[in-house]
Amino acid sequence: MFITNDIRYVGVNDHEIDLFEGQYVVPAGMAYNSYLILDRKTALFDSVDIRFRDEWLNNISSELNGRKVDYFIIQHMEPDHSSSIVEFMKANPDTVIVGNAKTFAMLDQFFEDVPANVRQTVKAGDTLELGTHVLNFVFAPMVHWPEVMMTYDSTDKVLFSADAFGKFGANDVEDPEGWACEAARYYIGIVGKYGTQVQNVLKKAAALDIKTICALHGPVLTGDLNTYLDLYNKWSSYEPDKNGVAIAYTSVYGHTKAAALSLAEQLKAKGVKIEVFDLARDDMAEAVEAAFRFDRLVLATTTYNADIFPFMRHFVEHLTERNFQKRRVAIIENGSWAPTAKKVILGLLEGCKDLTIAENCVTIKSALNAETRETLAKLAEEFAC
């Protein structure tokens, strides 16, 4: 596939995978992207998951038309992008591997048989001339691994962005919801903890004239790139994407669920955009993404072993691990003799910045009654705007 006259796509699609990184459900599969520049010298960007090594090598060969790969640029050492390196080098022993010092440290951790005499170490700001194409190396540490770097082709104005601007889903599957939905779930799940580091990279990118973004997952981005850059700026600064309420609940016998659904119906009747998640059954990553997407969050859970229900603890820890902040939060707790869920949740959220806790949090003892229904109605009023 042509990206520009000299840049070709040589990646693969994975429809065998069910869980990406062992935890994220990917019903539309995944893409492992790899790119090739054909100039006086040739440059290959990143490899693919080892299960698709042969397909990838065939893709490269068909584009080279008998030429060799001069440079193999390693932007990210995570195995879905690096596990085919050794097999490539066995077939191409004269290719120079380009990476930074941390790249090669990780290379030696993963593999024992990549020779040292074919390595070229680059530093931030270094350039590599291929002929008419000049590559500039932009370091992006902790987006989302420490060795990550991006590469800017100043000739075709293409940013090879590593995992940044990636999304879930194979590239041969039409996404009816567009780029942003699965890109948000991908960003928040995988990169979300590192907002400060993403902000630093966005500042570097602002100084570049970028016409195309080539990420390691998802489609090649062209056209009005401000759409994607603005969303990344919003996500990495932890600003809500939309006005609305995410309601996440756990329930043992249905009483806490009844309260959560009652609140949802009241908010819906007031014209509020809502999404409701049963944390024991629904996709946890979808619930986490919704908590970051909306400006309001309701946590409804039972007291369990003097703590909170395990799925709720898991959910809240997902939020805090990703620096959850700048939101309004309400709590609905339930406990038949000693409801302590609110206290536990507030303790878990203690380190989060700029959270506003609702005035009308609800404490249920066993089941809703007239008094708690009234408090629930007050919470609906409070969270309606």
PLM segments and residue spans:
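Active-site metal-binding motif and surrounding structural segment of the metallo-beta-lactamase
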Residues: 40, 51-98
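Active-site neighborhood of phospho(di)ester-bond hydrolases with catalytic His/Asp-centered motifs
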Residues: 45-47, 69-77, 97-100, 159-162, ...
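Short, charged N-terminal beta->alpha structural module
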Residues: 248-270
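FMN-binding flavodoxin-like domain, especially the glycine-rich phosphate-binding loop
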Residues: 171-213, 217-220, 262-277, 287-385
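Short acidic active-site motifs
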Residues: 84, 283-287
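Metal-dependent phosphodiesterase/nuclease catalytic metal-binding core
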Residues: 36, 150-214, 222-249
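Metallo-beta-lactamase
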Residues: 2-5, 99-148, 194-200
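Conserved beta-strand hairpin/beta-sheet module of binuclear metal-dependent hydrolase folds
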Residues: 2-60, 150-153, 157-161, 256
